[in-house]
Amino acid sequence: MTNLRKTHPLMKIVNSSFIDLPAPSNISSWWNFGSLLGVCLIIQILTGLFLAMHYTSDTMTAFSSVTHICRDVNYGWLIRYLHANGASMFFICLFLHVGRGLYYGSYMYLETWNIGVLLLFAVMATAFMGYVLPWGQMSFWGATVITNLLSAIPYIGSDLVEWIWGGFSVDKATLTRFFAFHFILPFIIAALAGVHLLFLHETGSNNPSGLSSDADKIPFHPYYTIKDILGVLLLILILTSLVLFSPDLLGDPDNYTPANPLNTPPHIKPEWYFLFAYAILRSIPNKLGGVLALVLSILILAMVPFLHTSKQRSMMFRPFSQCLFWILVADLLTLTWIGGQPVEHPFIIIGQLASILYFLLILVIMPITSLFENNLLKW
């Protein structure tokens, strides 16, 4: 009798994706983040579902309902902080996953990469809308500032902003629709992740060397299932440590003050995972220019495959490109730091220089260096 997992219409899909999937024998722990992102998404959907059972999306009661969840609901504080810090873990895994893709040339799988960029945008949109829901000071003013950026779009800008707000300011209509979108988007993300995997399994995984691994494949189970479980355990260890010991470490104290349209906080800033993009936005004195730079800072990832000039796929054997990659990482960390600082000297000029370097590295310096490396090897 044939094995059921290989013949059953549903089981054979699972089998070909997670059990008998041929995988390269040399993929390192940098390949764990895909499964970790899946786990993060499941954690976020489950905790979010239980939060939605107690949350009310009304400006008068939203803040109180979050307080009620933390004080009166059984383990409500745990669910709330798992959800808030789960978002931070999600973004840490996302950034490492994208960084891995850039380093090892995984972006050469165009469809997989472009759906990944789309996923990044979707997760960022979801996180932004989720941050508005507790209706604290930073929620309200963050929503006001970021949605207001759309008014920089010529001709239709101001109409577009009022359409998104559902009125003339961020109010009840805005909060209600943000809650609706925040609820639906994770399911769209899950569907997109399925398509992401579908395209990945068409080509098979890349590996650290960037060479074809067709000659040396091993089954996904048990090798990489065990490896993924180790990653998941480490993720859960870090997440629970964060939630149980310092749940507010990555949050903003201003969000414990209920939203007040008449009182602007001294420093409006988004969550830590948006600070790099926020720094790029602020470094350009022109509103429309800032918005374009903000969008391009993420959209530039879609251009990376077309800027690949090296004859080698991975950076494993390219020391100069490696050096530039780590400069890019340092630059992004600098931007993240600047995004959280007030707009004053010397932070303004540091932010502007870091923003210029970010775009220069990706668009100019790295492609030219790759050509230089080809030349060194007489390719």
UniProtKB/Swiss-Prot annotation:
Going by the UniProt record, its keywords in alphabetical order are:
Electron transport, Heme, Iron, Membrane, Metal-binding, Mitochondrion, Mitochondrion inner membrane, Respiratory chain, Transmembrane, Transmembrane helix, Transport, Ubiquinone
Record note on cofactor: Binds 2 heme b groups non-covalently.
Pfam families, per the entry = Cytochrom_B_C, Cytochrome_B
Write out the GO biological process terms: mitochondrial electron transport, ubiquinol to cytochrome c
Give the protein's biological function.
Component of the ubiquinol-cytochrome c reductase complex (complex III or cytochrome b-c1 complex) that is part of the mitochondrial respiratory chain. The b-c1 complex mediates electron transfer from ubiquinol to cytochrome c. Contributes to the generation of a proton gradient across the mitochondrial membrane that is then used for ATP synthesis.
Complexes and interactors: The cytochrome bc1 complex contains 11 subunits: 3 respiratory subunits (MT-CYB, CYC1 and UQCRFS1), 2 core proteins (UQCRC1 and UQCRC2) and 6 low-molecular weight proteins (UQCRH/QCR6, UQCRB/QCR7, UQCRQ/QCR8, UQCR10/QCR9, UQCR11/QCR10 and a cleavage product of UQCRFS1). This cytochrome bc1 complex then forms a dimer.
Name of the molecule in the record = Cytochrome b
